Design a protein with these regions (language model features):
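Gly/Ser/Thr-rich active-site loops/lids in small-molecule metabolic enzymes
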Residues: 60-70, 113, 119-140
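Catalytic core of DAGKc-family lipid kinases
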Residues: 1-102
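Residue-level signal for tight coil/turn positions that link beta-strands
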Residues: 38-39, 125, 195
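Glycine-rich phosphate/pyrophosphate-binding beta-alpha loops
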Residues: 47, 51, 104-119, 183
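A short catalytic or substrate-binding loop motif that flags glycine-/basic-rich loops and adjacent residues
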Residues: 79-81, 124, 161
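ATP/nucleoside-binding phosphotransfer catalytic cores, i.e., glycine-rich phosphate-binding loops
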Residues: 91-93, 97, 122, 132-208
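Exposed beta-strand and adjacent loop surfaces of beta-rich binding modules
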Residues: 84-86, 127, 174-176
Length: 208
């Protein structure tokens, strides 16, 4: 389920192949949401900014040679090129302007090798979770890394968070969008959630 198995992690499917096969045998069906950006579906996260540079740095050779460690290597490359950009985010009838290094819109809970979108994020809650990284230096991001692993990054004043069923994002110039590791769209963009759109075999939530 991708280089870092983030969808499997969100669904509580074990990394061990035998245990994963047991999930299929158990046959528990679960309906999950699907996100979309300009009509392109995604399960985990669609984002603008840092993660696009990361996706470009994380080429096939890096994935094959280093696996999950390749994310850390690609992240270091992306951080050296990080620049802020201006964006306008609309949710319902509210629009706000931001100067940011990354905007991420999550449908699932995990992405990027175990980073948490938001502490309360779930793939079957009928909502999208957005965050915008509005810090001024990459060193501030380095200090926040532990918070991203736990989903508590929203407590930092440099992180703007929002929750909704749809977002529209415009930027001062067209920017690529990374959706589940693939560059599938560009701004301006509309992000939507499609509740219960897919049925999967997965452990029951209380069994995870």
């Amino acid at each position: 389920m991708g280089t870092a198995n983030d969808l499997a992690r969100t669904l509580g499917i074990p990394d061990d192949l035998g245990q994963a096969a047991d999930v299929i045998v158990a046959g528990h069906r679960r309906r999950i949401d699907v996100g979309s950006v300009n009509g392109h579906p995604f399960f985990n996260v669609a984002s603008i900014g840092l993660s696009v540079d990361l996706a470009r740095s994380l080429d096939g050779g890096l994935k094959r040679r280093w696996g999950r460690l390749g994310y850390a290597i690609a992240a270091m490359r992306a951080l050296t090129r990080a620049r802020r950009f201006s964006a306008w985010i609309t949710e319902a009838d509210q629009t706000w302007r931001t100067s940011t290094m990354q905007i991420a819109v999550g449908n699932g809970r995990f992405y990027g090798g175990g980073t948490v979108v938001a502490a309360h994020a779930a793939i079957d809650d009928g909502h999208l979770d957005l965050y915008s990284l509005e810090f001024h230096t990459v060193w501030q991001l380095a200090m926040m890394l532990r918070s991203f692993r736990s989903g508590e990054h929203g407590a930092w004043s440099e992180v703007h968070t929002a929750r909704g069923t749809a977002f529209e994002i415009r930027t001062s110039r067209p920017m690529k969008i990374n959706a589940d590791g693939e560059l599938l769209a560009e701004t301006p963009a509309v992000f939507e959630v499609h509740p219960g759109a897919v049925t999967v075999l997965a452990p029951l939530p209380q069994d995870q």
